[in-house]
Curated annotation (Swiss-Prot):
The lineage of its organism: Bacteria, Pseudomonadati, Pseudomonadota, Gammaproteobacteria, Vibrionales. NCBIfam families: PRK13289.1. Residues 147-394 are annotated as: Reductase. NADP(+) binds at residues 268-273. The active site is at 95 (charge relay system), 135 (charge relay system). One of its GO terms (molecular function) is FAD binding. This is Flavohemoprotein.
Length: 394
């Protein structure tokens, strides 16, 4: 527990931190990577360059300071971050390194005096212990399951298939020939790439894009313009190549009984976690509505596969939006609507009792979806979303 003195000091200095903005976390990361360059093998340096990770950490620090007297309010954020940390295999020692550089950053930017530094050090220590304990629980849970493991495990690429103009699926099988641990539909897999093409080890998380299989994992990756790892996977990773994987993780997953109505909404490569959910609903009794938005048929991944899943079940329905259909794309056959997703078209599905809505896609798309869900009266506790990359509130 934090002392009252520490709480008051953190509250008093929080406005100064907030006023500084992401400059604080920029200084922190620059300092940490200078003194501990080995951490460049852990952090996504692309997110450092575009500022996303710096903004995410700054927002987390501000949220912690704002809720210093109400830590339970942070449990949702802690769960999300803890899962991501286990995919990076974060250790207790690394928390100590981060704490050292965070306190040094506050000292160098503000020179607030030892009392303030001690208060922030105490506050950081309490939060770090919360993460360390939760992450240890996740590590142990993963390792204790059948087919589970802790740390990294070697897999072989046994399948590679282009799903659209920009999305390719990769199927991995463990080289030891044993089973793989089960996961919850919507979770992701951590992939570790070491190549002489990269200055540092690169770690990425990709949503598992199929229902649970006994011996394999499938991810489906969009080729991002300028994306180091996505382009490497598309162009360089071939059948028979070996990679190291961390166990499945993530707090975005579907957990419903067979009588709960489900709506799955996605845009672009955001369909990967929702496809895993859809494949897992083949024995579902309640209505299932699939909504997907993409540019046109050239970008429409898993089109035939989803059609087969939906047409095989009377309780499933699919609606497709194309933003820029080609001359060959036929409305009513390839897609149903043009432009941006309008959830009023599925208002009846969203008005069902206890309907659970899962959505994923670009941040702007998810903000558009969340706004419509609120307008249609869907309770916030009944919709769930996933951001690819550092988390953003929609």
């Amino acid at each position: 527990m934090l002392s009252n003195q520490t709480i008051e000091i953190v509250k008093a200095t929080a406005p100064l931190i907030a006023e500084t903005g992401p400059k604080l976390t920029a200084h922190f990361y620059d300092r940490m990577f200078t003194h501990n360059p080995e951490l460049k093998d852990i952090f996504n340096m692309s997110n450092q360059r575009n500022g996303d990770q710096r903004e995410a950490l700054f927002n987390a620090i501000c949220a912690y300071a704002a809720n210093i007297e109400n830590l339970p309010a942070l449990l949702g954020a802690v769960e999300k971050i803890a899962h991501k940390h286990t995919s990076f295999l974060i250790t207790k020692d690394q928390y100590q390194i981060v704490g050292k550089h965070l306190i040094a950053t506050i000292d160098e930017l503000f020179n607030p005096g030892q009392e303030v530094l001690d208060a922030w050090a105490e506050a950081y220590g309490v939060l770090a212990n919360v993460f360390i304990q939760r992450e240890e629980q996740i590590y142990q849970a993963n390792a204790s399951q059948e087919g589970g493991w802790r740390g990294l495990r070697e897999f072989e690429l046994v399948g590679k298939q282009l799903e659209s103009e920009h999305i390719c699926s990769f199927v991995f099988k463990p080289t030891d020939g044993s089973k793989v641990t089960k996961y919850k539909p919507g979770q992701y897999l951590g992939i570790y790439i070491n190549s002489d093409k990269f200055e540092n080890q690169e770690i990425r998380q990709y949503s598992l894009s199929s229902s649970v299989q006994e011996n394999t994992y499938r991810i489906s990756v969009k080729r991002e313009q300028g994306g180091k790892v996505s382009n490497y996977l598309h162009d360089e990773l071939n059948i028979g190549d070996k990679v190291k994987l961390a166990a499945p993780a993530g707090d975005f997953f579907m957990d419903v009984d067979t009588n709960t109505p489900v709506v799955l909404i996605s845009a672009g490569v955001g369909l990967t976690p929702t496809l895993s959910m859809l494949e897992s609903l083949t024995e579902h009794h309640a209505p299932v509505t699939w909504v997907h938005a993409t540019e046109n048929s050239k970008h429409h991944a898993f089109k035939e596969h989803v059609n087969q899943l939906v047409t095989a079940k009377e309780n499933m329905n699919a609606l497709i939006w194309y933003n820029q259909p080609t001359a060959e794309d036929k409305i009513g056959e390839d897609f149903h609507f043009t432009g941006f997703v309008n959830l009023h078209e599925i208002e009846a599905a969203l008005k069902q009792d206890n309907v659970q809505v899962y959505f994923c896609g670009p941040v702007g798309f998810m903000q558009h979806v969340a706004k419509q869900l609120q307008e249609l009266g869907v309770p916030q506790e009944q919709f769930h979303y996933e951001c690819f990359g550092p988390h953003k509130v929609v």
